Amino acid sequence: MSFSSLYKTFFKRNAVFVGTIFAGAFVFQTVFDTAITSWYENHNKGKLWKDVKARIAAGDGDDDDE
């Protein structure tokens, strides 16, 4: 894609340029958030509440108070 066709498509009208920026930011945010959440949950597997809650409900919790 040459520069002139890129200019005519995205940069000539400000509304299209701003819309492209917002759409790109939205897509980047969605992909970045999904990737970071997946990495975080994988890195902390077994330590998160959703993992601990299942063990407590099953009765495998080590309760020294009882």
Swiss-Prot record:
Gene Ontology cellular component?
Answer: mitochondrial inner membrane; mitochondrion; respiratory chain complex III
Q: Which GO terms fall under biological process for this protein?
A: aerobic respiration; cellular respiration; mitochondrial electron transport, ubiquinol to cytochrome c; mitochondrial respiratory chain complex III assembly; proton transmembrane transport
Q: Which residues lie on this side of the membrane: Mitochondrial intermembrane?
A: 44-66
Outline which residue ranges sit on the Mitochondrial matrix face: 2-17
The protein's predominant localisation is mitochondrion
Q: Which domain of life is it from?
A: Eukaryota
Q: Mark the transmembrane ranges.
A: 18-43
Q: Identify the Gene3D superfamilies for this entry.
A: Cytochrome b-c1 complex subunit 9 (1.20.5.260)
**What membrane topology is annotated for this entry?**
Single-pass membrane protein
Keyword tags: Electron transport, Membrane, Mitochondrion, Mitochondrion inner membrane, Respiratory chain, Transmembrane, Transmembrane helix, Transport
**What SUPFAM superfamilies is this protein classified in?**
Subunit X (non-heme 7 kDa protein) of cytochrome bc1 complex (Ubiquinol-cytochrome c reductase)
Location in or out of the cell:
Mitochondrion inner membrane
Task: Give the UniProt family note.
Answer: Belongs to the UQCR10/QCR9 family.
Q: How does it assemble?
A: Component of the ubiquinol-cytochrome c oxidoreductase (cytochrome b-c1 complex, complex III, CIII), a multisubunit enzyme composed of 10 subunits. The complex is composed of 3 respiratory subunits cytochrome b (COB), cytochrome c1 (CYT1) and Rieske protein (RIP1), 2 core protein subunits COR1 and QCR2, and 5 low-molecular weight protein subunits QCR6, QCR7, QCR8, QCR9 and QCR10.
The free-text function statement in the UniProt record for this protein reads: Component of the ubiquinol-cytochrome c oxidoreductase, a multisubunit transmembrane complex that is part of the mitochondrial electron transport chain which drives oxidative phosphorylation.
**Note from the entry:** Present with 4550 molecules/cell in log phase SD medium.
**The protein's name in its UniProt record:** Cytochrome b-c1 complex subunit 9, mitochondrial
The species this protein belongs to is: Saccharomyces cerevisiae (strain ATCC 204508 / S288c) (Baker's yeast)
Task: Please name the taxonomic classification of the source.
Answer: Eukaryota, Fungi, Dikarya, Ascomycota, Saccharomycotina
